[in-house]
């Protein structure tokens, strides 16, 4: 009994207002009904598509018999009012495709449209069609088209209403689907025409289909989102509010079967080389997709090209204790990636680095069960003939029940010689009255190697949320044991427990007011290492974040959050730090906590005729992590987008962070990353791109300010010590790409990339080439 009381003391350290905020989860007015009080059930006609051409003109006879729907209403940033610019949406289907036509009304001079590459409609007006083909209100297809027919597609899922979510939904635009679209600007606005082949969709095997459906419209000059089916803010689910497409039947069962051979070549040279040398030992590869049913797909690949054609955007870590996350970009893993999503990233396919062979099954089994399975041989060797492989597997199963609720399991394993790692977890989600959501995941990992037999290392991830149009409340807790290690997953920080609660209040301005919406919130977090939490010890860190945000008429936005924190010293993070006392090297121990106070402000610019962007600035007290001492931090983030013509796109990003010693204002560390991307769209499928990135990193010689400024030393693996001297690197990366991609999977890429170093920041006088290379990739999709 005394042990139980001891362990429960960790919860006594949590302030009482945490439990007050938790109770607030249930004080939301539950008298509000679901948004769709009307029955938005659209009965679709089935028509003959033999004589239709997708050309942006809705002049064929068949469009006169289509179902017509209109009456758009505002959704973001303020919901409810009738949209200033309405549109008529025409819908029908044939036995092997579904068709949409739009007649959009707008001031011709305010229509924003460019010859954008796929998925790059950020500066354009566009219509986004949401198709929940399983009608399960969990994941849906997103097909978007701008006024001249350029495309943007992906999958759409709900966001839990919290301070991090800028929209009630998330669109993963990495998956690409085959569909036809054309559009044209008219005197009254614009018209678009779309054909989505049923081969591009997954749906159940029922003889009569009912799909979830909505149409969103992005109006760039006002930055408003409008919706065809009226939507309300503050609901626990975006997808649950959508309407239905009914009476879909007599569909052809066209089995998906794609074969995608690819050919690639690469040459490179290092700093000491004059000539290029071939880097391609296995130039041929093949990918295959086969529809096991209408809603289950088998993917297989042999010697695929899993390289990326654009380098990751360099990131600067605000908190060095946390790992940086980079999204997946490789098409094989992106197809059906929604079937592997879990509350915690226990399946992170970028951990599968160079698979020589892989297979994947994703889809639905019946109406309630979904499955995702990946098996791969990850090759650490230089070629197929000299393979050194690890076997990796990932399994995700999920069972739906009671509308939007589900339960699921995750299993992954990786084996390589004497090493093995296995992860198992269960999870579930419950949504009640479309106001309350509860989500949880718990599991463990076991890691074995030649020297140690591992023990189960637990983890958990819990959240509870409630929301309505005016209020939202949240409670979360996440924990990872010190030995929890998902070999195929991603966690930003291990040996970690977090307990947090927050609340948010939103106010809405009257029509015509300068301020359309004002939101204020507060969030408080406590963090521990895992064992101290279990043992009932005091938190290592606490953090308080008041937040304020404004949406102004015309598309302007302003948000600010204040950080007030206490960070405790973690000896584990500084095991390699020593100071020299006489002839003795002594470790970093018993350091005081650091109190932080500062602010971060973001200004969102409106979408002007050809220009938009955002600027973020932060300043205040923050840890000097390099020396574990108080520091003064200054942060700048800038994103600027300029479209001087319909074909030219210029994107500029700047990330800069400086940390100074407050005593003498000397610079401890800094990171600066300007990045310029210029794209010229020659045709709908053909573009040229240049990306230039300058990554400057500086760290001063380190001193132990708590020990009279004694020098800091690092301990080498051989037991010797080295002075932490000044360190500086300035790397330049320049990439050029010719891209031809008429349809997803069929493409020609020709590229050149170079990496250079600059001895002094921004001098550009003594730059030295570190490496450069050429590559070509060609692939073609045979759709059988």
Show where each model-derived region lies.
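Outer-envelope beta-barrel architecture signal
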Residues: 96-98, 139, 190, 207-211, ...
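Bacterial N-terminal signal peptides
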Residues: 17-27
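Surface-exposed extracellular loop regions of Gram-negative outer-membrane beta-barrel proteins
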Residues: 252-298, 391-447, 512, 517-521, ...
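Short secondary-structure boundary/capping segments
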Residues: 160, 230, 314-319, 426, ...
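Exposed, low-structure sequence patches enriched in small/polar residues
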Residues: 354, 362, 443-784
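Structural preference for beta-rich elements and adjacent junctions enriched in aromatics
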Residues: 32-400, 408, 418
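Alpha-helix capping and helix-loop boundary segments enriched in small/acidic/polar residues
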Residues: 275-276, 320, 349-352, 384-388, ...
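N-terminal secretory signal peptides that target proteins for export/translocation
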Residues: 1-13
């Amino acid at each position: 009994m005394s042990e139980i009381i001891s362990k429960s003391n960790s919860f006594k350290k949590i302030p009482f207002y945490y439990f007050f905020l938790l109770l607030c989860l249930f004080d939301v007015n539950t008298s509000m009904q679901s948004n769709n009080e009307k029955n938005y059930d659209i009965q679709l006609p089935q028509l003959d598509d033999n004589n239709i051409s997708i050309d942006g003109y809705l002049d064929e006879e068949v469009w006169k018999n289509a179902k017509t729907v209109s009456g758009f209403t505002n959704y973001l940033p303020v919901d409810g009012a009738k949209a200033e610019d309405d549109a008529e949406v025409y819908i029908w289907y044939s036995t092997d495709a579904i068709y949409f036509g739009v007649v959009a009304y707008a001031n011709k001079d305010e229509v924003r449209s460019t010859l954008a590459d796929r998925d790059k409609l950020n500066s354009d007006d566009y219509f986004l069609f949401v198709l929940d083909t399983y009608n399960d209100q969990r994941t849906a297809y997103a097909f978007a088209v701008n006024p001249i027919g350029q495309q943007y597609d992906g999958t759409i899922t709900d966001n839990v209403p919290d301070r991090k979510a800028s929209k009630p939904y998330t669109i993963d635009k990495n998956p690409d689907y085959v569909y036809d679209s054309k559009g044209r600007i008219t005197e009254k606005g614009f018209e678009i025409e779309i054909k989505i082949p049923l081969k591009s969709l997954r749906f159940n095997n029922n003889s009569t289909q009912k799909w979830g459906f909505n149409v969103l419209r992005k109006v760039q000059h006002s930055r408003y989102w409008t919706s065809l089916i009226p939507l309300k803010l503050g609901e626990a689910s975006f997808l649950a509010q959508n309407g239905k497409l009914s009476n879909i039947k007599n569909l052809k069962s066209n089995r998906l079967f794609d074969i995608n051979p690819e050919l690639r070549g690469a040459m490179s040279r290092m700093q000491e080389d004059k000539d290029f040398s071939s880097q391609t030992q296995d130039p041929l590869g093949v990918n295959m997709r086969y529809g096991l049913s209408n809603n289950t797909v088998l993917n297989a690949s042999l010697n695929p090209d899993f390289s990326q054609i654009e380098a990751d955007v360099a990131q600067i870590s605000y908190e060095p204790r946390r790992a940086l996350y980079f999204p997946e970009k490789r098409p094989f893993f992106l197809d059906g990636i929604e079937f592997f999503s879990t509350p915690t990233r226990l399946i992170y396919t970028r951990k599968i680095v160079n698979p020589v062979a892989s297979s994947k099954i994703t889809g639905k089994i019946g109406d309630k069960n979904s499955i995702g399975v990946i098996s791969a041989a990850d090759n650490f060797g230089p070629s197929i003939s000299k393979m050194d492989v690890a076997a990796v597997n990932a399994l995700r199963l999920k069972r739906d029940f009671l509308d939007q609720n589900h339960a699921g399991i995750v299993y992954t394993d990786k084996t390589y010689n004497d090493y093995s790692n296995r992860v198992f977890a269960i999870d579930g989600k419950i949504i009640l009255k479309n106001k309350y959501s509860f989500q949880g995941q718990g599991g463990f990992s076991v890691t074995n190697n030649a020297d140690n037999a591992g023990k189960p290392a637990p983890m958990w991830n819990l959240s509870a949320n409630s929301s309505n149009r005016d209020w939202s409340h949240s409670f979360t807790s996440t924990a990872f044991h010190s030995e929890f290690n998902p070999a195929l997953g991603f966690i930003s920080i291990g040996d970690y427990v977090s307990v947090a609660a927050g609340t948010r209040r939103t106010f809405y301005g009257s029509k015509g007011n300068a301020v359309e919406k004002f939101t204020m919130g507060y969030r408080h977090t406590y963090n521990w290492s895992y064992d101290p939490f279990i043992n009932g010890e005091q938190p290592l860190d606490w953090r308080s974040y008041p937040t304020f945000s404004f949406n102004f008429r015309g598309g302007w936005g302003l948000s600010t959050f204040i950080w007030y924190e206490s960070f405790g010293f973690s000896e584990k993070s500084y095991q390699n730090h020593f100071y020299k006392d006489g002839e003795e090297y002594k470790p970093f121990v018993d350091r005081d906590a650091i109190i932080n106070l500062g602010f971060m402000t973001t200004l969102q610019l409106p979408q002007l005729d050809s220009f938009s962007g955002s600027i973020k600035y932060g300043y205040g007290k923050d840890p000097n992590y390099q020396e574990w001492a108080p520091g003064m931090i200054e942060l700048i983030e800038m994103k600027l987008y300029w479209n001087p013509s319909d074909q030219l796109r210029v994107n500029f990003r700047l990330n800069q962070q400086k940390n100074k010693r407050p005593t003498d204002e000397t610079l401890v560390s800094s990171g600066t990353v300007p990045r310029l991307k210029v794209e010229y769209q020659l045709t709908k499928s053909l573009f040229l791109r240049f990306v230039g990135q300058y990554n400057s990193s500086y760290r001063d010689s380190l001193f132990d300010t708590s020990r009279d400024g004694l020098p800091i030393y690092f301990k080498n693996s051989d037991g010797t010590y080295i002075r932490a001297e000044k360190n500086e690197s300035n790397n330049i990366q320049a990439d050029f790409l010719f891209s031809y991609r008429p349809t997803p999977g069929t493409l020609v890429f020709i590229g050149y990339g170079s990496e250079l170093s600059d001895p002094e920041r921004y001098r550009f006088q003594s730059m030295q080439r570190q490496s450069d290379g050429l590559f070509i990739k060609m692939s073609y999709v045979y759709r059988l």
